[in-house]
Amino acid sequence: MSGNGVPTSHLRAVVRLVLYMGWTLLLVPVQMAAVLLNLSFARVIPIIYHRGCLFLFGISVFIRGEPVRGAPVLFVANHCGYLDIAIMGALVPCVFVAKMEISQWPFFGILARLQRTVFINRQDHLRTGTQRDILQNHLAAGENLILFPEGTSSDGNRAMEFK
């Protein structure tokens, strides 16, 4: 506990949250300009952002195996929580694929759009082919895609049904 009776873990959490908000507010305008001006480093800023987030939250990532080189990859992973995005986004230059509803979320929706997330309308079965073509175009352009097909997060103890 700190001297005023507040648990140190609470203070640490508040400090990390304030640092996270500062880090986010610092990089959002830079990324916004990079995306609007179609600058090549608009693909690099999200990696820097996610690595900074992991650092601020004290998260270390250990990688087993070798990354695929020379060809774009569609990564399909179970979604255990919001940190999955920071972890995956810190490891590879990528475009996330997310359900359309996320684009309307007040805070994370803005961050997702700035990272050039592809939003999929899972209810519109008539546009499945068009949405598939959009994903293929990203792969053809050499971009890695990251997809969490469950459509939600879980506790990570079991694989959920893909949607």
Predicted regions and their residues:
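A transmembrane-helix-recognition feature enriched in membrane-embedded lipid enzymes
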Residues: 2-62, 110-115
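Soluble catalytic domains of membrane acyltransferases
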Residues: 55-163
